[in-house]
UniProtKB/Swiss-Prot annotation:
Residues 262-326, 414-479, 502-608 are annotated as: Disordered. Keywords: Host cytoplasm, Host nucleus, Hydrolase, Phosphoprotein, Protease, Serine protease, Viral capsid assembly, Viral release from host cell. It is an enzyme of class 3 (hydrolase). Region of interaction between pPR and pAP is called Amino conserved domain (ACD). The region of interaction with major capsid protein is called carboxyl conserved domain (CCD). Gene3D superfamilies: Herpesvirus/Caudovirus protease domain. This is Capsid scaffolding protein. Its EC number is 3.4.21.97. Residues 617-637 are annotated as: Interaction with major capsid protein. Residues 432-450, 457-468 have a biased composition (Basic and acidic residues).
Amino acid sequence: MASAEMRERLEAPLPDRAVPIYVAGFLALYDSGDPGELALDPDTVRAALPPENPLPINVDHRARCEVGRVLAVVNDPRGPFFVGLIACVQLERVLETAASAAIFERRGPALSREERLLYLITNYLPSVSLSTKRRGDEVPPDRTLFAHVALCAIGRRLGTIVTYDTSLDAAIAPFRHLDPATREGVRREAAEAELALAGRTWAPGVEALTHTLLSTAVNNMMLRDRWSLVAERRRQAGIAGHTYLQASEKFKIWGAESAPAPERGYKTGAPGAMDTSPAASVPAPQVAVRARQVASSSSSSSFPAPADMNPVSASGAPAPPPPGDGSYLWIPASHYNQLVTGQSAPRHPPLTACGLPAAGTVAYGHPGAGPSPHYPPPPAHPYPGMLFAGPSPLEAQIAALVGAIAADRQAGGLPAAAGDHGIRGSAKRRRHEVEQPEYDCGRDEPDRDFPYYPGEARPEPRPVDSRRAARQASGPHETITALVGAVTSLQQELAHMRARTHAPYGPYPPVGPYHHPHADTETPAQPPRYPAKAVYLPPPHIAPPGPPLSGAVPPPSYPPVAVTPGPAPPLHQPSPAHAHPPPPPPGPTPPPAASLPQPEAPGAEAGALVNASSAAHVNVDTARAADLFVSQMMGSR
């Protein structure tokens, strides 16, 4: 149904005229720290202006997707500033066809054709990329330096966010820090260049535009926090009061939200208070798992605080979550409470001998021969020495991190959170430690810090303990010490886990093959009862105990393992020169693949250009460290 509707929209006749769209913005910013060949200085730009040939405007540096022309480029004190004209009916058709009709739903009057196009192109291609020709270090810049300007999602140069509008003045107006001389000069030059175009339009083709716009989305789908980056580039360019750039998380136009539902509380007994319709449902709240929250929740009751039980505001709209920077993990509140309850519940793991190897199936010899002295003892064999219950629980490690965080907050002058216990004592005791004023109305009250005996005078104020004062005025070195202690604790736990895989009193001698006393007699072959993979193998880096025998070769570290011979691979025989390939299997011949438009081959001309458009890269190691940490912590449970 949807494909038929899209086909009808594509096959609909094109509009008679194209909507002229003006685009304006900085092509680069001076002293912005652009790396390498992307950096431009005022002298280079001054030598390259005005361009020798008109600069085309294309999409994502595709020469076959030209949609407009640059009208003027002016050297502003902040960087080169340009104004261009876009007039392409096919670009409007592709964007309108791909966009859903729900994007433009609104309570007020319907948006015009120009407004819909401005919303789509502004939010899909909010940046530009200037393509320059590569030149040597000794080659001076000339008027052929600039090649073209490309509309893209995110440019590599800073501050290259552009504005689109149907009038020239409206496109330039949002740049509040633009020099007045630059504003007048670019307006005059753009008006003169527009007269020379005489209503020209561009038509690169619907198919070429479709593939180019799709490649733009694919190349930037891995971009993290795209709207945050766009907002930052927008501030760098000095844009204020922009109308069509939507840096929000909702996939609708401002003012397109449906009418708010009436407030219905469950305590007022209003009809429909228990309505479970999708419109009235509220998603489960998300909480940020911080170390101090885990520590405070594990030491207190597993029930959440009253403020956490009702995160929805009085208006019925859920509070927006704080923006994450990648240092927090977002999980539902119900799963968070289950994790806290499971961590705080007491565990009584079975006691195991210190350094005992892990339990496993051991391959013994003949059933009637008894246990061999060379095999390791069973896991239940009593060993003298200290017994321990495995690694310490997760609460101890988190408590160390919480102490470091609390010390860091005290060092920075920030008040400790409600769940932080990094500093001894409560707020009540710290309140009594401060010096009281000279005229204290509560002078007659007994001091709670000193014992009171009837008939005796009030004791003198106790001086502040130097150790307490030093602890309260902790410096950065104590914070570092606490962090080092936490890391050391984790390293010790890892060492204990590794030690458990070794024998308690050194490695065991290698296991020799079992020789049956009646092996000389002919007996029918019996299949092995135990798999060979369960044979105990001592670590190869530890030598057997005891002095080596003189004149004898030490036994190998690993016992010989029988390998079942498999079928030998066929030998490669060189084929004669007159050999023919095997005939294809009988059947209908598959139809040839549909020919798709191939991307433009990077020729010598393309290699001589410096394009400033960016593409997000795939990072396969994003969460590998976090997964390893979680697996180690959960493995000790």
